[in-house]
UniProtKB/Swiss-Prot annotation:
Species: Staphylococcus epidermidis (strain ATCC 35984 / DSM 28319 / BCRC 17069 / CCUG 31568 / BM 3577 / RP62A)
Protein name per its UniProtKB record: Deoxyribose-phosphate aldolase
Known pathway: Carbohydrate degradation; 2-deoxy-D-ribose 1-phosphate degradation; D-glyceraldehyde 3-phosphate and acetaldehyde from 2-deoxy-alpha-D-ribose 1-phosphate: step 2/2
BP GO terms, sorted: 2-deoxyribose 1-phosphate catabolic process; carbohydrate catabolic process; deoxyribonucleotide catabolic process
EC number annotated for this UniProt entry: 4.1.2.4
């Protein structure tokens, strides 16, 4: 197993600087991570710096609350792709899910999938805020909307990926969708536990530490 190719090397902090973006880009090149995952404002620069490499550029949409309108998420997705994004991690409308407005949740995801125009879409369901029933429903709606992955967490809601949630999500989507575990994956043991539970992608700022078998104190 090539661990690096399962990692989205991530920097989504509010105060991310160009120097920090350069660091994760250089690390991604050196370790050959699957992607760098950065906020939309950094997509064009990251795309330019990674041109000619195998490292993809991933970005986040409706992040971290999922509470922007569907039209805004759609535009944000198109803009990100125009700037060079190759993978899209979107946040669902969490409030609508909790209200039982499932059509609204599905339509929101569908709009992003359509705007992504064939690019990989990962749907962040924010597991820490959901009941088990809501987690299952969020996965089902993501599948119905045409997404490619379901993803556990933004890392901004006070909790991250757990083995139990990854197993539940994997059991729900089977082999039809993939599962991305993110938030709190800090070391090789965490990484291995998530992969064993069914994740096929890991979102982490601790990518280097994971590969080196070291511990990180980062939250994402």
């Amino acid at each position: 197993m090539n661990k690096a190719k399962l990692i989205d090397h991530t920097l989504l902090k509010t105060d991310s600087t160009k120097e920090q973006i350069d660091t994760i880009i250089n690390e991604a090149k050196a370790y050959q991570f699957k992607s760098v995952c950065v906020n939309p404002t950094h997509v064009q620069y990251a795309s330019e710096q990674l041109k000619g490499t195998d490292v993809l550029v991933c970005t986040v949409i409706g992040f971290p609350l999922g509470a922007t309108t569907t039209a805004v998420k759609s535009y944000e997705t198109k803009d990100a792709i125009n700037n060079g994004a190759q993978e899209i991690d979107m946040v669902i409308n969490i409030g609508a899910l909790k209200d039982g407005r499932f059509d609204k949740v599905q339509n929101d995801i569908e709009a992003v999938v359509q705007a992504a125009n064939g690019k990989t879409v990962k749907v962040i369901i924010e597991t820490v805020l959901l009941t088990e029933k809501e987690k299952i429903k969020a996965c089902q709606l993501s599948e119905a909307a045409g997404a490619h992955f379901v993803k556990t967490s933004t890392g901004f809601a006070g909790g991250g990926a757990t083995v139990e949630d990854v197993k539940l999500m994997k059991d729900t989507v089977g082999d039809r969708l993939e599962v991305k575990a993110s938030g709190g994956v800090r070391n090789l043991e965490d990484f291995n536990n998530m992969i064993e539970a069914g994740a096929t992608r890991i979102g982490a700022s601790a990518g280097v530490q994971i590969i080196q078998g070291l511990e990180s104190n980062t939250d994402y």
